[in-house]
Amino acid sequence: VAIVGRPNVGKSTLLNALLGQKISITSRKPQTTRHNLLGIKTTGSHQILFVDTPGIHLSEPKALNRYMNKSAKSALRDVDVLLFLLDRGKIGEDDQEVSRLFNQSKAKKVIVVNKIDLIENKNTLFPMLSRLQEKYPDVKLVPVSAEKNANLEELEKVICEALPESPFYFDAEQVTDRSERFLVSEIIREKLMRQLGDELPYAITIQIEKFEERDKATHIDATIFVEKDGQKSILIGKSGERLKRVGTDARKDMEQVLGVKVMLNTWVKVKSGWSDDERAIRSLGYDDV
């Protein structure tokens, strides 16, 4: 089941809500998700494999943007069900591009209208859903609020009805196929995105240099790459306060995910123009499509 949509419609929040635990990072900033991320939900006789995808966007100014779009579009292939996520039914330019790809897909389709809790006048909800149903007459519509866990049972029921029968691919306890190294790098990036202004988060990437278990703790060394010296200064903050705060917040989340004490060391380095350098982004782990 691929979850697709433009940036910032709540795809990662929806995945986390459906799984009942957080595996995909979130922030209020668009393009937080950079990789396809598999989430596995097993309940009784059902196992659903969800794929959270980067937001599809028309503007591709850098190699990183092209990678993200390529990742998202690759998820449209070989899936049984496609969830097209819309923010309160609004369809803008980027949504039109997703709609075009959605219509071309041979998968079973569901339109998920998210953030219904933010609709102030609830009387507008039914007319909006009716207009969408006219535009997509053969597609099932499900209004939800991923943030408030509203109507997710109905969405899961619709998904299960659309999925074919097949054996389980993963153990019932498994929630993702991503490594712990990947998950901890994403946790650091989430904390940075939440701490920093609008532009800087997009110039940041994380590389885990060391991931060792010893003395009843996991020891992690992480390098945070930025593109300019000025960005490095902003990220570190006055007397290192911002970086220290990011490290503390990240460590708490890591301990929750890993279930052990974490010793985290972080460094900030400049890698000029990495986000528009195909070779650099591959070396930094953006090479899975």
What are these regions (language model features)?
Residues 10, 151, 242:
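Conserved glycine(s) of the Walker
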Residues 33, 57-58, 91-92, 119-120, ...:
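Catalytic P-loop NTPase motifs of RecA-like helicase/translocase cores
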Residues 108-110, 117-180:
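Canonical P-loop GTPase G-domain recognition
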